Amino acid sequence: MAESWLRLSGAGPAEEAGPEGGLEEPDALDDSLTSLQWLQEFSILNAKAPALPPGGTDPHGYHQVPGSAAPGSPLAADPACLGQPHTPGKPTSSCTSRSAPPGLQAPPPDDVDYATNPHVKPPYSYATLICMAMQASKATKITLSAIYKWITDNFCYFRHADPTWQNSIRHNLSLNKCFIKVPREKDEPGKGGFWRIDPQYAERLLSGAFKKRRLPPVHIHPAFARQAAQEPSAVPRAGPLTVNTEAQQLLREFEEATGEAGWGAGEGRLGHKRKQPLPKRVAKVPRPPSTLLPTPEEQGELEPLKGNFDWEAIFDAGTLGGELGALEALELSPPLSPASHVDVDLTIHGRHIDCPATWGPSVEQAADSLDFDETFLATSFLQHPWDESGSGCLPPEPLFEAGDATLASDLQDWASVGAFL
């Protein structure tokens, strides 16, 4: 293997006898395998084919590669690149590099007779070929076999090519929305269906716009299309909110109904205000965080809520006395217990509060009225003692008639419950 690499690179003999008769490998062998110096010195424009070594043959054809002096070059190892000059930006495949010899260029497409040249593929898509076959048939519909026949008759390349192109024709007919399948009638002879061009895409397909398969267009239901045409234009992004005419009519009828039936004659003014059109609502601009303090108007509204909420100040004698002075118009009912003669001790948080002067006469008058009532009851009882003879008493029978009837019914219910037990 080492001898082959050294012989191809021209580095000299692969083996040299040493002083001891052994084999010595030169450093050029390692450099030829690992060095990439040839890649930096490689130039496409200045590439020249090296001459063959005298008296030797090149069985592998390595020296036919232009501009490659190193055996490790990928161009030398690829036999598909033989005989084809390389151009930057244009990759060369193995099939195209072997077809034409050097110096022979392919003819332009206009000068090629596709009906007789079996080596040049027509520069048309399969959809275009199908459309051309349908147009050439002069019929409204065509079968799949007729499409195959027209393509092979007019393009010699497909007569000698692999028959897999027929699968591509069938796939285009099935997947392309430009073609419609027409079922065969019962009385028509033959097998299979027909194909024709969709009139919606006929003009664009014939002009060459549908050389490749496109996505199907979006179809809108006719009902939605009419509704979209009847509705007004869309609401603009900026500006006040607009309401359609139907909503305005409903709002007007609701206002008229509530203004006539829901409001009486005495509230005519309020009903009149309801019938007025509603003002447009203006959106409030949010205040930045730096202006979170209340405005002067808000401070005026919050002014009555301000006050001294200190408990010591609230229960101060002077403050509480001033508050109790406002209770003079109220009638305070004193307690009905005999302890009303005792002085009331008002003490809050260890602070004594004097009893108002208005409480004194009311307590004394209530005590006098209580004594008078007790005296009146005692004297009336003494004047009308209980008559034990029974002449002035009610007979006990009427008093217990209702009670006896209720007691008898209760006992009867309990007897029925006892039977179940």
Swiss-Prot record:
Gene Ontology MF: a single term: DNA-binding transcription factor activity, RNA polymerase II-specific
Binding region for DNA: 120-210
Composition-biased stretches (Basic residues): 271-284
GO cellular component term, pick one: nucleus
Family the UniProt entry places it in: Belongs to the FOXJ1 family.
Keywords: Activator, Ciliopathy, Cilium biogenesis/degradation, Disease variant, DNA-binding, Nucleus, Primary ciliary dyskinesia, Transcription, Transcription regulation
Function: Transcription factor specifically required for the formation of motile cilia. Acts by activating transcription of genes that mediate assembly of motile cilia, such as CFAP157. Binds the DNA consensus sequences 5'-HWDTGTTTGTTTA-3' or 5'-KTTTGTTGTTKTW-3' (where H is not G, W is A or T, D is not C, and K is G or T). Activates the transcription of a variety of ciliary proteins in the developing brain and lung.
Domain of life the protein comes from: Eukaryota
Provenance organism: Homo sapiens (Human)
Ribonucleoprotein found in the keyword field: no
Compositionally biased spans, kind Polar residues: 90-99
Bias kind Low complexity: ranges: 66-80
GO biological process terms, semicolon-separated: actin cytoskeleton organization; axoneme assembly; brain development; cell maturation; central tolerance induction; ciliary basal body organization; cilium assembly; determination of left/right symmetry
InterPro entries noted in UniProt: FH_FOXJ1 (IPR047512), Fork_head_dom (IPR001766), FOXJ1 (IPR047513), TF_fork_head_CS_1 (IPR018122), TF_fork_head_CS_2 (IPR030456), WH-like_DNA-bd_sf (IPR036388), WH_DNA-bd_sf (IPR036390)
Renumbered residue ranges of the record's region Disordered: 1-34, 48-116, 261-302
Entry protein name: Forkhead box protein J1
Disease implication from the record: Allergic rhinitis: A common disease with complex inheritance characterized by mucosal inflammation caused by allergen exposure. Ciliary dyskinesia, primary, 43: A form of primary ciliary dyskinesia, a disorder characterized by abnormalities of motile cilia. Respiratory infections leading to chronic inflammation and bronchiectasis are recurrent, due to defects in the respiratory cilia. Patients with this disorder also develop significant obstructive hydrocephalus. Other more variable features include infertility and about a 50% chance of situs inversus or other left-right asymmetry defects. CILD43 inheritance is autosomal dominant.
Extent of the signal sequence: none
Record-linked SMART domains: FH
UniProt key word Metal-binding: no
Record CDD domains: FH_FOXJ1
Tissues of expression: Testis, oviduct, lung and brain cortex.
Localization terms from the record: Nucleus
